């Protein structure tokens, strides 16, 4: 397979990750503006978070996407899924009441989930043996670019921001010269979502031209030639009746679930950390977050040069050591800008060597093509579904004013230790092997 071709396909597919992460950050950063504009209560905000791209919406979408990608092909997802995404974003853009906003968040979240298993699976299946890890890293860089760019746009377009005058001009052109107050301010969030709509349209035009995965086609044709059932129930029946597949699901879900539970609640800790550091304005806090995401992108880019040459376990351990060091810094006290920078840099290193990279890589390597996307969709459903529940439980541990901060921090360390230990014990040796070789080693000729 042509090296440049695989890179081009990876970049086209990686735009999905930009849109996924961008939707999460755009939704979270604009909630206060929507709350004031629509007069939403904390219950309303809780529902928006619960069904969003960060929780239940993505969980449901992952199950749907995994099934569709295995049954109808990876190209099927890339032909239609971003149309669903654009409909969801357009609903948010045009929202004038809570039901519209809720529907937009849900549809966008489902689309985000649908794209995940197909994305990681397609990248691995279309990559050369010695470029599979590199291409997954390039894909993951988009998860860093998304939040970084959306945060910057949010800062520039926010009320009082450098480009808010441009937002005012646009808002008055659409809503009339009398538009003011919260109705005017919420246009800054609409503009951020507009940027996602534009990128989604570009990505859709690129992705719908992608070729189908050769491995999926070969597996499908072989199954038909043997007269095998290619239906959904049969695929999941095979998955759960195979001990190797079940053990793999448990292993991957364990390492990713424990790490993701920590990553998903970082938003609760950051305000507390900024307050502890003292004298940090909201703008400075956002800039620190942008720097953190820039570190994630830089570290992941560096990893892409070595992940196919050195043991995966080495980078997996280094990433979790950085994560544990981050929380030790937090527990010992973030005093002043020095501590704040240590926190941002360490968490950025963890993000650049994140468990998600290895989950995406191993998840696409350790299952046969006939239920590869479905298995990833199932695991993503489990992880994001538990994250939604954990987000509710965590608020009680943390407390309204952060009184449970220390206990919550120790919970984070315990979860990271579990991810580290399970990963070290179960990390597979797949480097330098084709997907066909890995499948034959693990599942035989069946």
Give residue spans per PLM region:
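Cytosolic juxtamembrane N-terminal segment immediately preceding the first transmembrane helix
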Residues: 1-25, 36
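Extracytoplasmic gate region of multi-pass secondary transporters
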Residues: 28, 243-300, 391
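Extracellular/periplasmic helix-loop-helix junction of adjacent transmembrane segments
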Residues: 28-60
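Helix-to-loop junctions at the C-terminal end of transmembrane segments
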Residues: 62-73, 299-311
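Helix-breaking motifs and short loop linkers at transmembrane-helix boundaries and internal kinks
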Residues: 73, 94-99, 333-335
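Cytoplasmic helix-loop-helix junction between adjacent transmembrane helices
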Residues: 104-141
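Glycine-rich segments within core transmembrane alpha-helices of 12-TM secondary carriers
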Residues: 133-163, 167, 199, 380-391
């Amino acid at each position: 397979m042509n090296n440049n071709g695989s890179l081009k396909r990876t970049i086209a597919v990686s735009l999905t990750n930009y849109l996924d992460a961008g939707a999460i950050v755009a939704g979270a950063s604009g909630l206060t503006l929507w709350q004031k504009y629509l007069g939403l209560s904390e219950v309303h905000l809780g529902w928006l978070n619960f069904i969003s791209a960060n929780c239940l919406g993505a969980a449901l979408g992952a199950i749907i996407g995994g099934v569709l990608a295995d049954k109808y092909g990876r190209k099927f997802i890339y032909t239609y899924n971003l149309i669903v995404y654009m409909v969801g974003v357009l609903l948010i853009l045009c929202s004038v009441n809570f039901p519209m906003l809720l529907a937009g968040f849900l549809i966008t979240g489902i689309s985000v989930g649908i794209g995940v298993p197909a994305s990681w699976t397609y990248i691995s299946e279309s990559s050369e043996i010695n470029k599979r890890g590199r291409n997954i890293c390039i894909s993951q860089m988009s998860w860093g670019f998304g939040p970084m760019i959306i945060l910057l746009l949010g800062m520039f377009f926010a009320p009082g921001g450098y480009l808010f005058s441009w937002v005012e001009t646009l808002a008055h052109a659409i809503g009339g010269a009398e538009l003011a107050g919260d109705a005017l301010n919420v246009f800054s969030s609409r503009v951020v979502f507009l940027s996602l709509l534009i990128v989604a349209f570009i990505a859709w035009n690129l992705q719908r031209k992608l070729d189908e995965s050769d491995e999926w086609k070969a597996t499908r044709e072989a199954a038909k030639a043997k007269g095998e059932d290619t239906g959904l129930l049969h695929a999941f029946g095979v998955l759960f009746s195979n001990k190797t597949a079940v053990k793999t699901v448990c292993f991957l879900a364990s390492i990713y679930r424990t790490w993701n539970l920590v990553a998903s609640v970082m938003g609760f800790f950051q305000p507390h950390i900024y307050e502890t550091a003292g004298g940090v304005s909201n703008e400075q806090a956002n800039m620190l977050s942008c720097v953190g995401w820039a570190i994630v992108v830089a570290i992941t880019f560096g990893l892409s040069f070595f992940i196919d040459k050195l043991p995966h376990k080495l980078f997996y351990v280094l990433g979790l050591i950085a994560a544990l060091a981050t929380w030790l810094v937090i527990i010992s006290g973030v005093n002043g800008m020095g501590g704040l920078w240590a926190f941002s840099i360490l968490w950025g290193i963890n993000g650049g060597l994140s468990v998600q990279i290895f989950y995406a890589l191993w998840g696409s390597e350790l299952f046969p093509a006939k239920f590869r996307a479905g298995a990833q969709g199932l695991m993503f459903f489990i992880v994001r579904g538990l994250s939604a529940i954990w987000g509710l439980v965590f608020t009680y541990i943390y407390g309204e004013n952060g009184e449970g901060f220390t206990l919550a921090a120790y919970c984070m360390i315990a979860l990271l230790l579990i991810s580290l230990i399970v990963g070290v014990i179960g990390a597979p040796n797949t480097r330098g092997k084709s997907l066909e070789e890995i499948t034959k080693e693990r599942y035989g000729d069946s």
